[in-house]
Regions:
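Positively charged n-region of N-terminal signal peptides that target proteins for export
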Residues: 1-5
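C-terminal motif of bacterial Sec signal peptides marking the signal peptidase cleavage site
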Residues: 15-18
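Bacterial signal peptide processing site
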Residues: 20-23
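Juxtamembrane membrane-water interface segments immediately C-terminal to a transmembrane helix
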Residues: 27-34, 38
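N-terminal alpha-helical signal peptides/signal-anchor transmembrane segments
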Residues: 36-52
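Extracellular/periplasmic head regions of type IV pilus-like filament subunits
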Residues: 57-131, 138-236
Length: 236
C-alpha cells in the first residue's frame, strides 16, 4: 500500500512539474532579464577580442534602419562562448531580437520586441489592400510636415490599431510618412523620458538616444525626434 501511495505521489509531482514548466518557460521567453543581456554582452566582447575587433553579427543591407542593422548572430557565439541563446531570444522561441548599437566605438547589446514587427506587417498588409483599390493611403490628419495620421475606418478597422510600448507598457499609435511607410509614434514615451533626462539633450538633436542610453530597448520602426519647448516633436 505504501509503495502504491509513493508511486501516486511521484506521478502527481511529475504532472505538476510538467504543468509549471511551460508557464516558467513562457515567462522566461518574455522577460528582458538583465543577466541575459549581460551574458550576451560578455560573449560579444569575448568574440570581438578573439577575432580582431570583428563582431558576431548578421549581414544586413546598408539601407537597413540603424536600430535593426546589427542583429547578433548567435551561431557565432554558441556554444563556445555561451551554451545557448537566452530563453527570451527569438532564436529560442522568445519575443526579443538581440542587436548591437554603437558598433564603432562601444558595441552594446540591446533588444527589439519582435511582436512590434508583426503588428507593423499586419497594418502594412491592410494598407496595401486599400491602396490596390484607391491608389493613395487614407490620410486623415497632418501631424507635421510629411507625417500623417491614417483614417483607419476607411481601412476596415473598428478600433484604432496600437502597439504596446516596451518602455512604459502604454499603447502607442502609428503614423505614416509621405512615402507610405508606417512607423510607431513614440512621443508619449519620449515625453516621459524628457521629464527624467531632458537636461541630456537639446533642440536639434535626435532624442531617441535617450531610449538607447537608459533602457534595454531600441526604438525600432521610428522616425527621428527632437525636443522643442520641453516636448518631443518629429525631426527631419
Amino acid at each position: 500500500m505504501k509503495k502504491i501511495l509513493m508511486v501516486f505521489v511521484l506521478c502527481c509531482t511529475g504532472m505538476l512539474s510538467g504543468c509549471l514548466y511551460p508557464k516558467e518557460k513562457v515567462q522566461q521567453n518574455v522577460v528582458p532579464y538583465e543577466e541575459q543581456l549581460q551574458a550576451v554582452q560578455t560573449a560579444v566582447n569575448t568574440y570581438r577580442e578573439q577575432n580582431g575587433n570583428i563582431l558576431p553579427i548578421k549581414t544586413r543591407d546598408m539601407n537597413t534602419p540603424i536600430y535593426q542593422k546589427y542583429p547578433i548572430d548567435f551561431q557565432k557565439i554558441t556554444p563556445r562562448l555561451m551554451q545557448e541563446p537566452p530563453g527570451n531570444a527569438f532564436e529560442s522561441g522568445g519575443i526579443y531580437q538581440y542587436v548591437l548599437v554603437d558598433v564603432e566605438t562601444n558595441p552594446t547589446v540591446k533588444l527589439i520586441d519582435v511582436r512590434m514587427a508583426e503588428q507593423i506587417r499586419d497594418l502594412k498588409l491592410k494598407l496595401q489592400i486599400y491602396r490596390d483599390e484607391h491608389q493613395y493611403p487614407p490620410f486623415k490628419k497632418v501631424i507635421t510636415d510629411g507625417v500623417y495620421e491614417l483614417d483607419y475606418k476607411k481601412m476596415g478597422y473598428k478600433e484604432i490599431p496600437q502597439v504596446e510600448s516596451p518602455y512604459s507598457g502604454k499603447n502607442l499609435p502609428f503614423v505614416i510618412d509621405e512615402k507610405g511607410e508606417i512607423y510607431i509614434d513614440y512621443r508619449i514615451d519620449l515625453y516621459d523620458m524628457l521629464q527624467k533626462y531632458g537636461d541630456e539633450v537639446k533642440e536639434g538633436e535626435d532624442i531617441r538616444q535617450l531610449f538607447v542610453k537608459h533602457t534595454p530597448f531600441v526604438p525600432v520602426y521610428s522616425l527621428p525626434y527632437t525636443v522643442k519647448n520641453k516636448e518631443p516633436i518629429f525631426f527631419k
